[in-house]
Structures are given as structure tokens and as C-alpha cells.
Amino acid sequence: MDIQFLGTGAGQPSKARNVSSLALKLLDEINEVWLFDCGEGTQNRILETTIRPRKVSKIFITHLHGDHIFGLPGFLSSRAFQANEEQTDLEIYGPQGIKSFVLTSLRVSGSRLPYRIHFHEFDQDSLGKILETDKFTVYAEELDHTIFCVGYRVMQKDLEGTLDAKKLKAAGVPFGPLFGKIKNGQDLVLEDGTEIKAADYISAPRPGKIITILGDTRKTDASVRLAVNADVLVHESTYGKGDEKIARNHGHSTNMQAAQVAVEAGAKRLLLNHISARFLSKDISKLKKDAATIFENVHVVKDLEEVEI
């Protein structure tokens, strides 16, 4: 499980950073890629990665500002031109209005897609659990921005315990089909009468990962709730230390506020995202250094960077 950042800039593209988009790569888990936001130029960034557009099965939009959605029509159209690859349907989750935006863009441009898009729109009254599969659950909660905006909490369901092969061999169980039966929870009786209780040879289930991906927001309790015990918290950092007032006026956060959210939520790792173009390389180091005085395990991400979860 990895996150690859396709755009880490704020507001408009710059030479160093494209606008908002990231890919949650779940290839080992479910052979899918989930996109979160799709700003202008996202498909260009994807061309610089190993991501295959057909593997993108779901797109989650945080809000309808242009720097988070203007790349959708282009990506959806390009996804249709995957030669020699089977076309697969796509699901888009986002605030009310995302369906109208996509369908209008496709209609006026005369674009016809050879696959179906299933839209899942929500408003302030229809948040909470928005998706559940056999391996993942996704929650959405409203943040505090200048327009309706949400954050997402992706929870991997607990993983099966592992089989203690060494202990089984010591108990006289021959390697082979019997191992598989025990792994599936089946109790056995060996030829010599030894009873093998499957539960004695399988470790406890392992907790799944928690990934929190926030849209644009002021510091808010909703961010903390979404990030409780998160393995990774992706939080915007449009402004730096000392800019709390201007950040609030524009519906954004500082690096220090993001660090405070990570502390209050008990998150394990903080990734600062949505970086303003006014920050030069030396300022990026300061963003991290300042935030680390509050939350030590912090990192400022850059375009095309891949982070293992």
C-alpha cells in the first residue's frame, strides 16, 4: 500500500508543483488505484508514473474548487484510450455538483466514454460511511473551507492472523494440505490421535491501516476526528508559522496547525501537502522544521513522491 503524490501545490500550477491530486495504490490488496482529487494536469503527472489509468477504479473529490477538479474531463477521456485493455467502470465520490460538472464537460466537448461512471454525490446531511467493501471502509466528514469540502478516512479491515509453521511442525503436522486447513480455521486430529486446535497456531488478527486524506480546511475538530490513530495523515499546509490569521481568512491551515491536528488525533505520521508556490526550497525546510517542534514525524511531500504506508 502506497500513496503517490501527483500534485502537491496550492491554487495554481507552478514549475515545481502541480495542483491537487494523489493516488492511493492498493495493488497488492485489491489490484486497484484510488485517486483523491484530480486537478488540472493530473493525467500528465500520471504519465510520469507506473500507474495505469485502467487501474483507477474510484475517484474521491474533496471539493469543487478548480484546482481539485479541472483535470477530471481530460483524465476520464484519456482513460478511454487504453489500447488493448479491457474497459472497466469507474466510481466518482464527491460533493453535489460533481456529476453535473463531469457530464456537462463531456457533453459540450462531444466526448463519449466506452465505460460507465457511477456517481456518489453527498451533502452535509449524507456524510459518514460512504463506501464499504470486504477489505476497506471509507468515511467522509465536512471540513471548514470557503465552500463545502470534506476529508476522507480510509480504513483497511483487520488482516487475518499468520500461521505459525514452526510450531505446527514441532507438533508433528506435516507440511502440505493440512497447513491450509488449519489456516482456514479447521481443527484436526492427526493419525496418532493428537488434536490440533487451529486457534492455537494462528496469531491474532492484525489491525488494518488507517489513511486520512483531508481537503482544504481551517483547523477544525472534524480533522482530528478523521485522523484518530491514523497511520498516515495527509494535511494541507498552504501557510507557514505566523500566518494563522491569513490562513483562517482564506479557509486554509498552517503547518503548525496541521501538526497540532496530528498530535490531538494521535496520528503516526504527518504528510504536509497543498504547498503555496511562494515557498522556495529553503522555506520548505523551515515548514518541516517548525512543524516538527510540535509533531516530530512530519514530512513535506513533493510531486511524484511515493510514500509506503
From Swiss-Prot:
The cofactor binding remark recorded in the entry reads: Binds 2 Zn(2+) ions.
Location of the active site: D67
UniProt catalytic activity: Endonucleolytic cleavage of RNA, removing extra 3' nucleotides from tRNA precursor, generating 3' termini of tRNAs. A 3'-hydroxy group is left at the tRNA terminus and a 5'-phosphoryl group is left at the trailer molecule
Source organism, top-level taxon:
Bacteria
Which SUPFAM superfamilies does the record match to this protein? Metallo-hydrolase/oxidoreductase (SSF56281)
Q: Which cofactor does it need?
A: Zn(2+)
Root EC class: hydrolase
Output the Gene Ontology terms for molecular function.
3'-tRNA processing endoribonuclease activity; zinc ion binding
Which UniProt key words apply to this protein? Answer: Endonuclease, Hydrolase, Metal-binding, Nuclease, tRNA processing, Zinc
Entry's EC annotation: 3.1.26.11
InterPro entries associated with the record: Metallo-B-lactamas, RibonucZ/Hydroxyglut_hydro, RNase_Z/BN
- The UniProt record gives the binding positions of Zn(2+) 1 as H63, H65, H145, D216
Q: Which residues are recorded as binding Zn(2+) 2?
A: D67, H68, D216, H274
Q: Which family does it belong to?
A: Belongs to the RNase Z family.
**Listed NCBIfam families:** PRK00055.1-3, RNase_Z
Biological function: Zinc phosphodiesterase, which displays some tRNA 3'-processing endonuclease activity. Probably involved in tRNA maturation, by removing a 3'-trailer from precursor tRNA.
What assembly does the database describe for this protein? Homodimer.
List, alphabetically, the HAMAP family matched: RNase_Z_BN
**What is this protein identified as?**
Ribonuclease Z
Q: Origin organism of this chain?
A: Streptococcus pneumoniae serotype 19F (strain G54)
- Supply the gene name: rnz
